[in-house]
């Protein structure tokens, strides 16, 4: 898929705008879609925010009263909203907590860039139907895909 066929709407809350690399987010999305041979054009929205916002979203949409690192909301095909025939296929929304990016990068001993890219890749894979919570085989498949995509981006665990 050509990068021109990938529309990524990256929104970063103001307090993190100076530290979040939106280009890295776009690259991680594109690499994930190319690796999985997704046909374009497609569109994804990504919000980079704080623990409080992600906590609220987690509570509202999943019934979980806790913050988390990444949430994915795949576009359902109920067709309640009619899109023009030439519009990109909307894959869904991802919300990422920058607070978790910082904490987990420190905990795992790698860069914030790698952690951010990991969470983007993880979220996009969920939008594509992958689910590590289905069992050990699915978890191993998803982890292998994540590592391959991060490797293609040049983001090792040590980076």
From Swiss-Prot:
GO terms for biological process: rRNA processing. InterPro entries: MetalPrtase_cat_dom_sf_prd, YbeY, YbeY_CS. GO terms for cellular component: cytoplasm. Gene3D superfamilies: Metalloproteases ('zincins'), catalytic domain. Its EC number is 3.1.-.-. The keyword Nuclease applies. It comes from the Bacteria. Its cofactor is Zn(2+). Belongs to the endoribonuclease YbeY family. NCBIfam families: rRNA maturation RNase YbeY. This is Endoribonuclease YbeY. It comes from Roseiflexus castenholzii (strain DSM 13941 / HLO8).
